[in-house]
């Protein structure tokens, strides 16, 4: 009888472990704590970067990618022919200059231009908790305008 009582807890543990399924391929889960763990390293990386910018690629899949970005100064003007950007603001504040025309942008990769300036466009103030979606072929640039830093989670949806 004593052996049976010893075997019952072991059997329960084995059955519950077998009942749990593995996460599906491609599933990712980032908690606020796991994202916060990257902040100090990204802050250090940004302090040595000429653009005062650091990025941590979290996942790269055929149709999308996810990254964490830390900025301590204005970003470059950007334009993506086929990608959608979705920003989830974690902390800090910035102004998003969006729309208008990218002038003198340089091709930096397939379907992507950076640098240059944006003529026209509208400004949207961003702060923690905000989410924005930037469609393909829309120039955009983050401006800190006096803020010391800006942290955001980015999903890039690839359209090619």
Locations of regions flagged by a protein language model:
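His/acidic/aromatic-lined binding-pocket segments of jelly-roll/cupin-type domains
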Residues: 78, 85-88, 123-124, 131-132
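An anionic, turn-rich surface loop/hairpin at beta-sheet edges
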Residues: 105-127
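Bacterial N-terminal signal peptides
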Residues: 5-16
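A short, N-terminal "cap"/entry segment at the start of jelly-roll beta-barrel domains
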Residues: 18-81
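Conserved metal-binding segment of the jelly-roll/cupin
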Residues: 125-145
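Short, conserved beta-strand element in jelly-roll/cupin
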Residues: 81-96, 100, 110-114
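A short hydrophobic beta-strand segment most commonly corresponding to one strand
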Residues: 147-160
């Amino acid at each position: 009888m004593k052996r049976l009582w010893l075997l019952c807890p072991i059997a329960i543990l084995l059955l519950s472990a077998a009942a749990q399924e593995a996460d599906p391929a491609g599933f990712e889960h980032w908690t606020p704590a796991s994202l916060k763990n990257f902040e100090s390293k990204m802050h250090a990386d940004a302090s040595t970067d000429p653009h005062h910018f650091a990025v941590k690629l979290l996942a790269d899949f055929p149709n999308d990618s996810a990254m964490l970005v830390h900025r301590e100064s204005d970003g470059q003007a950007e334009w993506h022919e086929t990608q959608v950007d979705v920003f989830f603001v974690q902390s800090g504040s910035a102004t998003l200059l969006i729309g208008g025309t990218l002038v003198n942008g340089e091709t930096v990769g397939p379907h992507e231009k950076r640098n240059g300036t944006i003529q026209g466009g509208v400004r949207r103030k961003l702060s923690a908790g905000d989410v924005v979606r930037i469609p393909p072929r829309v120039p955009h640039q983050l401006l800190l305008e006096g803020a010391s830093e800006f942290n955001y989670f980015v999903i890039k949806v690839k359209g090619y």
